[in-house]
């Protein structure tokens, strides 16, 4: 690698490329003279589109090929949507930077209805996320929830073709792609608690690459990093993956972190909720203790059922 060149491994979806260009522009603004190249790749998650993520290995399908490129020194950094980043990293790799967060809420998107509550009974709602399905089913058990895979454009096309009455997407993705006008309503966390890290962009690199880590330091957003740290600590303690509905959302209000979380049965029949408030420096411990509260309040049984008896201790 030339000293003035930095290579970004990225997926080729429009949203992934937006994120990669966002990081590229930030790096070049912070380090004049730096040459930043994109290394576009196809991941298994981009190829397997006919099966729900939970059944084919979860969100890690979107990052594995990028991590291999880092380990083989074909790229220097990988740019991820934080909600797709697994809790564990391959040896030698790690998350070193979290950029400023976009709006983390879920978006209600429909051509005929202004809100979730306006949908008639029997309406078909599309989402690929068990977390969203679970919360939808709890609030509106009279709706028909169907799986929806593909990139943002594909999902919107399926809505426009009449396959769904409404779909649920991330506000952040729609805003970044210039599609904010498609949002009929942003769902508050009380209705749809976001995914861990939703709306944030994370950067992974080789942990022994001190030059790259120095270049990335300017892009780290302290408040976002604190919030995502609390959310991910909760998820790590739960050993959360794609197979179980887990939501976690931290806000920084008046110098204090407010962390909310839930674990649910996939059909929405049971949702265990909890929250914590505390000092920012305690973000990680807050996440762990909230996870333990959820486990003790019934989440352990939900996880055991989903994972065939193999629940966190």
Swiss-Prot record:
EC number(s) from the headed UniProt entry: 2.5.1.61
Any Pfam family the entry gives: Porphobil_deamC
Entry keywords, A to Z: Porphyrin biosynthesis, Transferase
Keyword Lipid biosynthesis: no
Metabolic or biological pathway: Porphyrin-containing compound metabolism; protoporphyrin-IX biosynthesis; coproporphyrinogen-III from 5-aminolevulinate: step 2/4
Gene Ontology BP term (one): protoporphyrinogen IX biosynthetic process
Matching PROSITE patterns: PORPHOBILINOGEN_DEAM
Top-level EC class: transferase
Effect of residue 11 to L: Loss of activity
Catalysed reactions, as listed in the record: 4 porphobilinogen + H2O = hydroxymethylbilane + 4 NH4(+)
Additional note from the record: Arginine residues that are closely associated with one another might be involved in substrate binding.
Identification of the protein by name: Porphobilinogen deaminase
